[in-house]
Amino acid sequence: MGELWHIKEGTEEEFPGLIGVDGYTDSSIRTIVIESTITDDTDPMAKANLEEYKKVVVRHEIVHAFLYESGLEGNTNEIKNWSQNEEMVDWIAIQFPKILKVFNLLEVL
């Protein structure tokens, strides 16, 4: 990325920015914060594999950080803030392991 970022894990009480989300990126202090209790035992729709889901959340927030470090966080207003589009960021975060596997297989890194 070029700059040192920190990844913290905590609760909504420790990090109010987590209210309603599983993670967020604070570009002003180069910090990624991930919810440490991404589970609700009373929710029948809760994720079964929380460790894998947390990895996706961390990758998602890292994509946001890379977009910020690339100067794209605030410079995409002409195209409806595409760099902050959650679907696009999710796509990169979810597909990256597959893309990396193909790049490694083809030895194109």
What are these regions (language model features)?
Residues 1-54, 68-69, 78-94, 109:
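Active-site scaffold of zinc-dependent metalloenzymes
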Residues 56-68:
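Active-site recognition of the HExxH zinc-binding catalytic motif
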Residues 65, 69-74, 96-103:
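Amphipathic alpha-helical interaction segments
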Residues 103-109:
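Long, well-structured alpha-helical subdomains associated
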